[in-house]
């Protein structure tokens, strides 16, 4: 019997693409790179912040006939992205229609609800508190403890901490 449900955040619970795109574009343009489009941002997200920035810089460099991404460029874009995304993560994000009602219904049916995201953990928690306060049993984002999906550390952690029956945990390494 299913007792717990794990959700992604971006593109599943919330529409956050505009805030992500605007933040990355401010970092890119400030460092002499070209902007990415919404469609490109959608294509580049999903594997964590490092991949998003690396793909965005490489795309800009392809236009200038080189796709080499230097660590110094990555660090400069990252610094601006992190600052801007703190401003945009709430103001430029929308909860998908009926999501809160659906989650509340699942909660009332006895499911444990979790978020496991490749977004930085420092962004996940404020977003969950703002959009879905009190709904999720735990929300985790990218961190040294969890890593990024498809790494199974996040699922292992949630299973070991929140599923009380030891027999349900046997297959987890």
Regions found by a protein language model. Name each.
Residues 1-43, 54:
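Active-site neighborhood of HAD-like aspartate-dependent phosphohydrolases
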Residues 7-9, 81, 155, 162:
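Conserved hydrophobic/aromatic "anchor" residues
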Residues 19, 48-51, 122-123:
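Short alpha-helical
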Residues 29-35, 61-70, 108-109, 132-135:
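Short helix-capping segments at alpha-helix termini
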Residues 46-85, 105:
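A metal-dependent, Asp-based hydrolase signature
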Residues 83-115, 121-126, 152, 156:
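Short, acidic loop-to-helix structural element flanking the phosphoryl-transfer center
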Residues 91-94, 120-164:
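Substrate-recognition "cap/lid" segment bordering the active-site pocket of phosphatases
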Residues 161-173:
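Single conserved hydrophobic/aromatic residue that forms the stacking wall/gate
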């Amino acid at each position: 019997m299913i007792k717990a449900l794990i959700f992604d955040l971006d593109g599943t619970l919330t529409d956050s693409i505009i805030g992500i795109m605007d933040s990355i574009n401010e970092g890119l343009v400030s460092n002499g790179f070209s902007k990415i489009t919404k469609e490109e941002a959608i294509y580049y997200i999903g594997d964590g912040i490092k991949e998003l920035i690396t793909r965005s810089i490489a795309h800009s460099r392809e236009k200038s006939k080189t796709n080499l991404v230097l660590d110094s460029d990555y660090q400069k874009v990252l610094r601006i992205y992190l600052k801007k995304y703190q401003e945009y993560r709430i103001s430029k994000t929308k909860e998908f229609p009926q999501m809160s009602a659906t989650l509340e219904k699942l909660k009332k049916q006895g499911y444990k609800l979790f978020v496991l995201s490749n977004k930085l953990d420092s962004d996940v928690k404020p977003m969950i508190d703002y959009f879905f306060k009190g709904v999720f049993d735990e929300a985790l984002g990218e961190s040294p403890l969890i890593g990024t999906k498809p790494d199974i550390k996040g699922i292992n952690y949630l299973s070991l901490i929140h599923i009380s029956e030891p027999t349900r945990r046997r297959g987890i390494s």
